[in-house]
Regions:
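FAD-site-proximal beta/loop scaffold in flavoenzymes
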Residues: 120-141, 215, 219-221, 227-299
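FAD-binding core/adjacent interface of flavoenzyme oxidoreductases
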Residues: 1-6, 62-145, 220-224, 231-236, ...
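Beta1-alpha1 glycine-rich phosphate/pyrophosphate-binding loop at the start
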Residues: 2-73, 161-182
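A short alpha-helix-loop-beta-strand transition element characteristic
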Residues: 29, 56-60, 67, 254, ...
Length: 382
């Protein structure tokens, strides 16, 4: 009897792959090992839980048992894979070996928590998963003042949602502007103004050096010398791929588990996708590349030839009162063609030959996003 396909992880990437495989083959044996309960949920909804007044339970689409039954998989919930033997093609769990025909790492990423001193530093919370939100939801619902460490995509989305739900929010960001790695300054400034209008305090070009207890509050001491009182401190300082298991079994790992266009790792019959994978040198923690990865990998697991081809992809910043959508590569931009109106911004990024390299649209101008995405795709094919 053929050994099953084994998937480590039960997040969006893992379950997208399961669905893809099952659309093509209803019976090939699939085993999923996960450290949590295996519940299916929509992770992007975590950006809106506070304003939507949702509990962790509200976000669950299906229990792990229901998902396993519907998709005919063997689910090992609350089960940590201790080791992978890539020569023998086995995973080791609780001292028992489980053989695989093909193995997929879908181990995701964890929220990065910067090293910070102070007696309250261990009380920092993260919101990168349903389980983390479940642990923190009562604490956050009681809190009036919340400090968000990090002004990137996750930090900005959470901050706006918390403010919309009535919390007093401060965002601390070491860069001189928000979303510094994602959008140009002329888009960041109106976003910052919108956040300020919603009552959000911004502490830019500084970081949190220490968090200590003070009476019933937490006090965050900033590197610039200022102190901010808060009831809760959330770390939204980016993600780090979960690679320890891959490293331990000898796979090639950089920021993520290194894979080629076929999602193959450095070991035979071992693959990776999702937030843990570094695809040809790129980390892509967004839904669309994961869906496309799952489609390509699903075919390969069933013996078909398939390569991942990534078109220009849209990134949506989920900030409802100032929506932003963007696509493309801004690294070689020499010129921005910008239209600014009262209803938003439409900006095209061009190289020295006036070729479209990317775009950013905001506010009501987001209606231009899909026509610009088509134009960007055509420019890439020219």
């Amino acid at each position: 009897m053929q050994a099953p396909i084994v998937i480590i992880g039960s997040g969006f990437a893992a379950y997208q792959l399961v669905k893809t495989v099952r659309r093509m083959d209803a019976h090939i044996p699939l085993q999923v090992f996960t450290a949590d309960d295996g519940a299916e949920y929509n992770k992007p909804d975590l950006s809106h839980v506070f304003s939507n007044k949702q509990t962790a339970r509200d976000l669950v689409v299906k229990s792990g048992e229901a998902f396993a039954q519907e998709h005919n998989i063997e689910l090992f919930a609350h089960t940590k894979v201790e080791h992978v033997d890539v020569q023998a093609q086995q995973v080791l769990v609780n001292g028992q070996a489980y053989p695989y025909s093909k193995l997929v790492f879908a181990t995701g990423a964890k929220a990065f928590v910067p090293p910070i001193s102070g007696d309250a530093a261990p009380e920092m919370i993260t919101l990168n998963s349903l389980q983390e939100y479940q642990l923190a939801e009562e604490q956050i619902s009681r809190a009036k003042r919340i400090l968000v460490m990090g002004g990137g995509l996750i930090g900005v989305e959470i901050a706006m949602d918390l403010a919309t739900s009535g919390k007093a929010v401060t965002v601390v960001e070491p860069n001189p502007r928000l979303l510094a790695n994602l959008i140009p300054e002329f888009v960041a400034l109106p976003l910052e103004n919108q956040l300020k209008q919603q009552g959000i305090q911004l502490a830019l070009e500084t970081g949190v050096a220490a968090i200590n207890h003070s009476n019933d509050s937490l006090v965050a001491s900033l590197s610039q010398g200022k102190a901010i009182e808060a009831d809760v401190v959330i770390s939204a300082a980016g993600l780090r791929a979960n690679t320890w298991l891959a490293k331990a079994c000898g796979l090639s790992v950089n920021k993520g588990i290194e894979v080629n266009a076929r999602l193959q790792t450095s070991a035979a019959n071992v693959f990776a996708l999702g937030d843990c994978a570094e695809i040809q040198g790129r980390m892509m923690p967004y839904l669309q590349p994961i869906v496309l990865s799952a489609n390509a990998l699903g075919k390969q697991l069933l013996g078909q030839e398939a390569e991942l081809k990534l078109p220009p992809m849209m990134v949506k910043v989920k900030t409802p009162s100032y929506p932003i959508q963007l696509a493309g590569d801004f690294s070689s931009v020499t010129n921005w063609s910008v239209q600014i109106s009262q209803t938003g911004i439409a900006a095209k990024a061009e190289d020295e030959n006036s070729r479209l390299m990317g775009f950013v649209v905001t506010g009501e101008q987001v209606t231009q996003a899909f026509p610009l995405l088509r134009e960007l795709s055509q420019a890439g094919q020219a």
